From Swiss-Prot:
The gene is LY6K. Specifically expressed in testis (at protein level). Pfam families: Toxin_TOLIP. GO terms for cellular component: acrosomal vesicle; extracellular region; membrane raft; plasma membrane; side of membrane. This is Lymphocyte antigen 6K. GO terms for biological process: binding of sperm to zona pellucida. Residues 1-17 form the signal peptide. It is a lipid-anchor; GPI-anchor. Residues 47-141 form the UPAR/Ly6 domain. SUPFAM superfamilies: Snake toxin-like. Interacts with TEX101. It comes from Homo sapiens (Human). Glycans are attached at residue 20. Required for sperm migration into the oviduct and male fertility by controlling binding of sperm to zona pellucida. May play a role in cell growth. It is found in: Secreted; Cytoplasm; Cell membrane; Cytoplasmic vesicle, Secretory vesicle, Acrosome.
Length: 165
């Protein structure tokens, strides 16, 4: 799993170009088939790193009635977001329950999924307080400050011990 995540992080930026579209990113309107009705759903179809802000409106195929937005955490401060049309849905959005705070600290690799059937309903992800996310990301670096202090104190004690002998 770690090897797959490493390969994704290293190789993904090299292969991505605007001309290199996956089958899900291609516009179904470009196909030869024109006998489909007008009741197909419109969704955003795109992938981004570390943000839910991507737009690429596409009309889904008639066999794909759902818009999906999914986020997968690869490293503690690195996640991939995919928006696409889908034939099935693992989790349907129900009437909004009480608002809950969105946490990025959970040790789960898959941390957000939303399915819906309304035009462009997969535009926005969960409400993330960017300052809280940055504080969480910065706390990793702050914990290393104690390590440098310990190393400095160790070197000072060694130097003091050598000067006494």
């Amino acid at each position: 799993m770690a090897l797959l995540a490493l390969l994704l992080v290293v190789a993904l930026p090299r292969v991505w170009t605007d001309a290199n579209l996956t089958a899900r990113q291609r516009d179904p309107e470009d196909s030869q088939r024109t006998d489909e009705g007008d009741n197909r759903v419109w969704c955003h179809v795109c992938e981004r790193e570390n943000t839910f802000e991507c737009q690429n409106p596409r009309r889904c195929k008639w066999t794909e009635p759902y818009c999906v937005i999914a986020a997968v955490k690869i490293f503690p401060r690195f996640f991939m977001v995919a928006k696409q049309c889908s034939a099935g849905c693992a989790a349907m959005e129900r009437p909004k329950p009480e608002e809950k705070r969105f946490l990025l600290e959970e040790p789960m690799p898959f941390f957000y999924l939303k399915c819906c059937k309304i035009r462009y309903c997969n535009l926005e992800g969960p409400p993330i307080n960017s300052s809280v996310f940055k504080e969480y990301a910065g706390s990793m670096g702050e914990s290393c400050g104690g390590l440098w202090l310990a190393i400095l104190l160790l070197l000072a004690s060694i130097a003091a011990g050598l000067s006494l002998s």
